[in-house]
């Protein structure tokens, strides 16, 4: 049996840091209030730097390729999960292909599942390796949500940071991705929006979110999907070594960990330093944990994410 196994990870975050103390000067908020409500102390932001969605994706990809120890010429697919592409078209994936000078006989495309984008992209890549003969796939999660937040809205501007994370998936006989599950419900599409499309747009697109409703749904749906994927994989909660959640809200993360019976020290947390980086949050957290020596080859990881759409998903894998 052929598995898709993570061979290398990489990430990138902008240099500029926006702290809660900085936000206290911009909106009516406090460090104590932000930490208590969401668990964010600081976030990295593009601001006026030369960084953008494409450059961050490229830098994260380079680091993943370096860790994987592969020749970039062997990459036979690029999938980018992002909701904040630099352009309507071309895709971010094609721009990454250009900057990495990858060969042309490969598919490269973006998918938009907002904060769940990386898990969606990972699931698609897994199927291409299992069923279509792909050998090395570059999967990236990247977003620049600080470019669409309303800096006068204290309920949302405190949440988000910018960044990118990437993995190299390689076809392997040893177990890698065991299962993925993806769900969506468009009936809740108005709960998180940023209207910048062709047909309906704001002069300056801003992210709007009904936070209380999103919180309740996230706790419920993530709890259900982690139970579903563990059962589908024939495992027990005690088999999970690490939970790597989407870093959206500390209270949501704690609720999922409690449902799994996982102590806090078995949960990878970067929300305090990164904020919510949308599709980048899971690969950013994974990269940080691998490079810190926390997560090791053979560990069983549960990834889960929830975002606009509403779209949510989970992946269970052996590193």
UniProtKB/Swiss-Prot annotation:
Where are the annotated segments for ACP-binding?
247-251
Where is the catalytic site?
115, 246, 276
Q: What is its EC number?
A: 2.3.1.180
InterPro entries, alphabetically? ACP_syn_III_C (IPR013747), ACP_syn_III_N (IPR013751), FabH (IPR004655), Thiolase-like (IPR016039)
**CDD domains assigned:** KAS_III
> What UniProt keywords are attached to this protein's entry?
Acyltransferase, Cytoplasm, Fatty acid biosynthesis, Fatty acid metabolism, Lipid biosynthesis, Lipid metabolism, Multifunctional enzyme, Transferase
GO biological process: one example: fatty acid biosynthetic process
Positions of disulphide bridges: none
Pfam families per UniProt: ACP_syn_III (PF08545), ACP_syn_III_C (PF08541)
Q: Which domain of life is it from?
A: Bacteria
Transmembrane segment boundaries: none
Q: Which GO terms describe its molecular function?
A: 3-oxoacyl-[acyl-carrier-protein] synthase activity; beta-ketoacyl-acyl-carrier-protein synthase III activity
Q: Catalyzes what?
A: malonyl-[ACP] + acetyl-CoA + H(+) = 3-oxobutanoyl-[ACP] + CO2 + CoA
The broad enzyme category this protein falls into is transferase
Q: Where in the cell is it found?
A: Cytoplasm
Record-linked Gene3D superfamilies: 3.40.47.10
Involved pathway(s): Lipid metabolism; fatty acid biosynthesis
Q: Which GO terms describe its cellular component?
A: cytoplasm
Q: Which family does it belong to?
A: Belongs to the thiolase-like superfamily. FabH family.
Q: What is the protein's quaternary organization?
A: Homodimer.
Q: What is known of its domains?
A: The last Arg residue of the ACP-binding site is essential for the weak association between ACP/AcpP and FabH.
Could you identify this protein by its name?
Beta-ketoacyl-[acyl-carrier-protein] synthase III
Species of origin reads: Coxiella burnetii (strain RSA 493 / Nine Mile phase I)
